[in-house]
């Protein structure tokens, strides 16, 4: 094992001084101070020595603190003013004549807190103008003795208060010493030879042959290095990006919609009855302003007919829901509860010519549910939803698309189970298998019912599916509480890696 020259110089310092423990100042007599820590870090990784850190808190007066040593803290300024002007008291409103604007409130508060004054009809009356202020005494001591370990527990509390008031600041100083371990002791028992070394060859060295005179230092990939945590995207953002890239690779294009939607687009167009529990205030965020929105009248009439009796004009689609549809309810605004509204609005925007072509779109965005926050529910979360519209697609195609999508996200084992959703028929749930957890439900899907598509003049089958990305993130990151995704835990954010599966 060949050591770096700086490592050798550091060990030679121990050899020549015949010491087992040395500090930074002592070692800097043998090797440049800026190189000591680097060499010591390398040697500690080789188990040659141990770096011992002794942390000390020291206090340092600020500019305000130094001024207060000469002029007094604000409370003392008030006392001195009264004393110098032979006054018995001073009106509170006159404090601004003595103190800076930002000192006035704090000075009055501290005078009362310390029990130095009484307030009589808006006047400040000192009980003793020659009082002793422990804060002033500690401030003076801090100007001479910086080491907090020399202060009593009560004095440290006063130091903390002086820090809050801006008179001083507290810094942490780290003193390091270096102790040889057995491997290092064994190494310095032998002569230490330091050769001139180089880390790279130049053309001149090669042409002249001088490279033979140097020792070329080999690279050691096993030497421990300091961990670096460069800026990176949040794990949730990485998962959103990954899902986006997977869907684009599968031939989908992304669409968007507004966060605030009318109930018409969010519920009515999906054949969800107006008395459905999902529309209750405990499940949906209703917008206070604007509390209504514009609804296209021609589509409203068609959707209304579908809801009431399952007809569009003279064409019978189904039985409908058999209730009186309220157009005023359709105009109410809500925070969207799903991203399916993006696909529905996209389908509604298609021209007659565009409806003849196959369509594959998806949306990844935030949705909102008025739910109590717990380990698996948040009022705001990301959802991904997609549709495929084509002449010859069927349930088997839907299953194939979902399996391909989930496998591209790293889930090899996928199974399909029957399910119910109000706007698709047939419907399914896709489950994925994870070691140690078993089968877990991940997404819902189905084929849009005719009641959803007919108002837009769409006759082709439309496959639809949706997945909660927070749920996906929990599975990928091994989390048991959805709230952990949004905590400001810097260590977790630094060290979390999204596996490239």
From Swiss-Prot:
It comes from Methanococcus maripaludis (strain C5 / ATCC BAA-1333). Binds 2 magnesium ions per tetramer. This is Phenylalanine--tRNA ligase alpha subunit. It catalyses: tRNA(Phe) + L-phenylalanine + ATP = L-phenylalanyl-tRNA(Phe) + AMP + diphosphate + H(+). InterPro entries: aa-tRNA-synth_II (IPR006195), aa-tRNA-synth_II/BPL/LPL (IPR045864), Phe-tRNA-synth_IIc_asu (IPR004529), Phe_tRNA_ligase_alpha_bac/arc (IPR022917), Phenylalanyl-tRNA_Synthase (IPR002319). Its EC number is 6.1.1.20. The lineage of its organism: Archaea, Methanobacteriati, Methanobacteriota, Methanomada group, Methanococci. It comes from the Archaea. L-phenylalanine binds at residues 340, 423, 448. Its cofactor is Mg(2+). GO terms for molecular function: ATP binding; magnesium ion binding; phenylalanine-tRNA ligase activity; tRNA binding. Tetramer of two alpha and two beta subunits. Keywords: Aminoacyl-tRNA synthetase, ATP-binding, Cytoplasm, Ligase, Magnesium, Metal-binding, Nucleotide-binding, Protein biosynthesis.
């Amino acid at each position: 094992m060949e050591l770096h020259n700086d490592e050798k110089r550091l060990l030679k310092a121990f050899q020549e001084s015949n010491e087992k423990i040395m500090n930074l100042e002592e070692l800097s007599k043998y090797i440049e101070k800026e190189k000591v820590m680097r060499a010591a870090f390398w040697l500690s990784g080789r188990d040659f020595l141990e770096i011992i850190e002794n942390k000390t808190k020291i206090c340092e007066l600020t500019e305000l603190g130094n001024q207060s040593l000469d002029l007094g803290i604000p409370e003392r300024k008030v006392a001195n003013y009264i004393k110098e002007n032979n006054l018995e008291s001073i009106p509170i409103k006159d404090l601004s004549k003595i103190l800076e604007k930002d000192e006035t409130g704090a000075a009055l508060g501290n005078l009362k807190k310390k029990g130095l004054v009484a307030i009589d009809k808006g006047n400040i009356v000192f009980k003793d103008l020659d009082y002793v202020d422990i804060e002033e005494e500690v401030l003076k001591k801090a100007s001479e003795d910086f080491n907090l370990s020399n202060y009593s527990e009560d004095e440290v509390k006063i130091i903390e208060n002086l820090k809050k008031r801006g008179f001083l600041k507290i810094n942490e100083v780290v003193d390091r010493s270096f102790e040889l371990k057995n491997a290092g002791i064994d190494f310095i028992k032998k002569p230490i030879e330091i050769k001139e070394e180089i880390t790279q060859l130049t053309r001149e060295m090669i042409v002249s042959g001088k490279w033979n005179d140097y020792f070329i230092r080999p690279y050691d990939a096993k030497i421990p290095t300091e961990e670096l945590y460069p800026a990176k995207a949040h794990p949730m953002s990485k998962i959103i990006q990954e899902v986006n890239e997977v869907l684009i690779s599968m031939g989908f294009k992304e669409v968007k919609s507004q966060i605030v939607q009318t109930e018409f687009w969010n519920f009515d167009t999906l054949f969800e009855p107006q008395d459905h529990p999902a529309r209750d205030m405990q499940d949906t965020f209703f917008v206070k302003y604007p509390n209504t929105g514009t609804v296209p009248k021609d589509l409203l009439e068609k959707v209304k007919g579908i809801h009431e009796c399952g007809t569009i004009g003279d064409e019978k689609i189904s039985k409908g829901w058999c209730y009186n549809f309220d157009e005023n309810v359709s105009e109410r605004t809500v925070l969207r509860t799903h991203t399916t509204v993006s696909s529905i609005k996209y389908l509604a925007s298609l021209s007659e010519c565009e409806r003849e072509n196959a369509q594959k779109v998806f949306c990844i965005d935030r949705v909102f549910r008025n739910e109590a926050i717990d380990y698996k529910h948040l009022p705001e979360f990301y959802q991904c939803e997609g549709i495929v519209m084509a002449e010859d697609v069927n349930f088997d195609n839907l299953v194939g698309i979902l399996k391909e999508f989930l496998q591209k996200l790293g889930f090899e084992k996928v199974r399909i189970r029957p399910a119910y959703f109000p706007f698709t028929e047939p419907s399914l749930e896709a489950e994925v298998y994870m070691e140690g957890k078993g089968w877990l439900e991940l997404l819902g899907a189905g084929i849009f019912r005719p009641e959803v598509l007919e108002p837009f003049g769409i006759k082709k089958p439309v496959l639809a599916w949706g997945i909660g990305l927070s749920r996906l993130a929990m599975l990928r990151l091994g989390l048991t509480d959805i709230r952990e995704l949004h905590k400001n835990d810097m260590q977790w954010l630094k060290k979390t890696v999204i596996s490239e599966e």
